[in-house]
């Protein structure tokens, strides 16, 4: 595995981890269905209606903008079809924009840095976050700690 691929994959994994945290708060970087939210919470990523995982798309492509390849803020989640559309129908085409799946609009970054996906409040959140409930915050913190430990354990097993 090349260094570029390893860095890119780490950024995508980190972006999914961040998305999981957002979903736990009733938020996300796109409008996830309740089923997709549940998948993010339980499996670490979302799946489309055909059971295919959403893909992490480097808005500023890793090939053309290697300085951004390891940054999880440069990742947006798209279905395979949306991802291909973001590349103008050819995977070899570099990207330098945010792709809006509902409108198919591309918001070009030009010579500037990427702009991270907007965090939105989900219309149908599966997690209800009580206001000012410290016990919930403690449970969430403990779950996050356990999730991090599990991921570290799995990484050690793979080595």
Regions found by a protein language model. Name each.
Residues 1-55, 60-158:
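Nuclease and nuclease-like effector domains acting on nucleic acids or nucleotide cofactors
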């Amino acid at each position: 595995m090349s260094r570029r691929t390893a860095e890119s994959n780490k950024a995508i994994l980190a972006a999914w981890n961040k998305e999981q945290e957002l979903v736990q708060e009733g938020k996300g970087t796109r409008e996830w269905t309740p089923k997709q939210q549940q998948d993010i919470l339980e499996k670490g990523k979302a799946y489309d209606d055909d059971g295919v995982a959403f893909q992490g798309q480097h808005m500023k492509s890793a090939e053309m903008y290697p300085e951004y390849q390891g940054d999880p803020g440069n990742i947006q989640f798209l279905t395979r079809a949306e991802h291909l559309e973001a590349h103008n129908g050819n995977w070899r085409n570099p990207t330098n924009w945010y792709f809006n799946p509902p409108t198919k609009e591309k918001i070009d970054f030009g010579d500037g840095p990427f702009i991270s996906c907007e965090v939105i409040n989900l219309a149908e959140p599966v997690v209800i976050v009580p206001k000012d409930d410290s016990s919930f915050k403690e449970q969430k913190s403990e779950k996050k700690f356990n999730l991090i430990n599990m991921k570290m354990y799995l990484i050690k097993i793979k080595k």
